[in-house]
């Protein structure tokens, strides 16, 4: 929500949805701690009625978060339509947060919790089939989400910190750029809008004295950045982003995730993500955050 919208008294509604086992309950708990009025598992058909309550000006409903999942499959089909209708109103600002995780991670979480998947409560099918069906059903709502968060590699504390960063930052209403480094060997960054592969650059892994360090350490950072190939790539990348980013903002996107990947996610991608975040902070007035997903995984880059 922008400052102008707050001044005009518009209410804020956040719909939290996504894969079962991806962390919706934890997000709702975090939002409740931050002062949101939270509702868990509201049927989508009741969403317009709840918005009408918000529009009546009740102070306790100024900031609302509603978790909606796929338990009622038939009811869920109307969610995108209901969201479109609410977005056309001028008294409520609606955002959608979509949580997801890799299938193997969701399976692991369900085994730990010993709970049944909502699409497999009778145990009549395999868990992986239920997860795949859910992912297919959720593809449409994912496509309209303002925020897509992959929780595969996030610990509960890290997920809470990310939610806090979104909603406790006084500049939250501005366009946000998240720059992330990752290692392809650990899987691509699932929530990325733009992915850049820097595995063509000289690799510090093969310099024995640099191998134990990461791209945030000065010797590795300087090694990665000193090459002509790196400078040419960085110049071309920033030229492209200077052209693209304002366009994303103009089209109404509130968050852009830029992922930079190398083999292990410890050296080249970390150095480039660090430099890119610094550069974007210098030339734009947007919120720019940087995260190094795999930087502290035991070194094994090739």
UniProtKB/Swiss-Prot annotation:
Entry keyword annotation includes GTP-binding: yes
Keywords, A to Z, come to: ATP-binding, GTP-binding, Nucleotide-binding
- InterPro entries reported for this sequence: P-loop_NTPase, RapZ-like, RapZ-like_N, RapZ_C
Q: Does the keyword ATP-binding apply?
A: yes
Q: Which Pfam families match?
A: PapZ_C (PF22740), RapZ-like_N (PF03668)
* List of residues binding GTP: 69-72
Per UniProt, where does ATP bind? 18-25
Q: Which domain of life is it from?
A: Bacteria
Molecular function terms from GO: ATP binding; GTP binding
The family note in this entry says: Belongs to the RapZ-like family.
Could you tell me what this protein does?
Displays ATPase and GTPase activities.
What protein name applies here?
Answer: Nucleotide-binding protein SERP0433
Organism for this UniProt entry: Staphylococcus epidermidis (strain ATCC 35984 / DSM 28319 / BCRC 17069 / CCUG 31568 / BM 3577 / RP62A)
């Amino acid at each position: 929500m922008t400052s102008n919208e707050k001044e005009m008294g518009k209410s804020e509604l956040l719909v939290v949805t996504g894969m079962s086992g991806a962390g919706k309950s934890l997000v709702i708990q975090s939002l409740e701690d931050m002062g949101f009025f939270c509702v868990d598992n509201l049927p989508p058909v009741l969403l317009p009625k709840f918005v009408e309550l918000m529009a009546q000006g009740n102070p306790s409903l100024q900031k609302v978060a509603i978790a909606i999942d796929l338990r009622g499959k038939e009811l869920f089909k109307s969610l995108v339509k209901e969201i479109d209708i609410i977005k056309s109103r001028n008294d409520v600002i609606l955002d959608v947060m979509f949580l997801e995780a890799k299938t193997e991670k969701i399976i692991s979480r369900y085994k730990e919790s010993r709970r049944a998947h909502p699409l497999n409560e009778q145990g009549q099918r395999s868990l992986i089939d239920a997860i795949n069906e859910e992912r297919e059903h959720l593809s449409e709502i994912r496509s309209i989400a303002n925020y897509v968060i992959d929780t595969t590699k996030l610990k509960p504390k890290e997920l809470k910190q990310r939610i806090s960063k979104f909603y406790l930052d006084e500049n939250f209403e501005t366009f946000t750029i998240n720059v992330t480094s990752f290692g392809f060997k650990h899987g691509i960054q699932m929530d990325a809008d733009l992915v850049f592969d820097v595995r063509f650059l000289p690799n510090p892994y093969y310099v024995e004295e640099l191998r134990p360090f990461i791209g945030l350490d000065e010797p590795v950072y300087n090694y990665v950045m000193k090459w002509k190939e790196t400078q040419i790539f960085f110049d071309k990348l920033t030229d492209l982003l200077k052209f693209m980013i304002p366009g994303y903002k103009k089209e109404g996107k509130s968050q852009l995730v830029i992922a930079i990947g190398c083999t292990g996610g410890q050296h080249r991608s970390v150095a480039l993500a660090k430099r890119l975040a610094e550069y974007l902070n210098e030339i734009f007035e947007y919120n720019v955050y940087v995260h190094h997903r795999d930087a502290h995984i035991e070194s094994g880059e090739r």
